[in-house]
Curated annotation (Swiss-Prot):
This is UPF0325 protein VP2321. InterPro entries: UPF0325 (IPR020911). The lineage of its organism: Bacteria, Pseudomonadati, Pseudomonadota, Gammaproteobacteria, Vibrionales. HAMAP family: UPF0325 (MF_01519). Belongs to the UPF0325 family.
Length: 127
């Protein structure tokens, strides 16, 4: 029924609650969240990274200039189609987009702060 999700090792798609998709450098990161089971504090999730496909597009035919562009991996689009059938996501409003951008920014701040602290701790060990 869901061959691409099964290919990712997800054998019970009915347990999927939602998913998120974000871009990091030249990769798309898909995170799938499952329904929380009894006795669990947090819902389980799995993360998959897909490299973006690189294409050269002709920008100016007179000078034969090309521009390198990236686009979503074809396999990822097939997985997202299956996820949309399961989760039936609602239309996203402009306010929701703003909230998502702010949420992504806060997440990035935490990741960078954590990495800086880790590097500083490594430096302290060297003293």
């Amino acid at each position: 029924m869901y061959p691409h999700l099964t290919g990712l090792g997800i054998h019970d798609p009915k347990q999927i609650e939602r998913y998120s998709l974000r871009q990091e450098a030249h990769k798309d990161v898909l995170k799938i969240y499952f329904h929380k089971q009894k006795g669990e504090f947090f819902a389980k999730s799995v993360k998959f990274k897909y490299p973006r496909q690189v294409k050269n597009v002709l920008v100016d035919s007179g000078s034969h200039k090309y521009k390198e562009v990236t686009e979503i991996n074809r396999n990822l689009t097939l997985v997202i189609d299956e996820l949309n059938k399961i989760t039936k996501p609602a239309k996203v409003s402009e306010l929701d987009v703003k909230q998502k951008i702010l949420s992504d920014l806060r997440h990035l701040e935490k990741v960078v702060s954590s990495k800086i602290a880790e590097i500083e701790a490594d430096l302290e060990k060297l003293k």
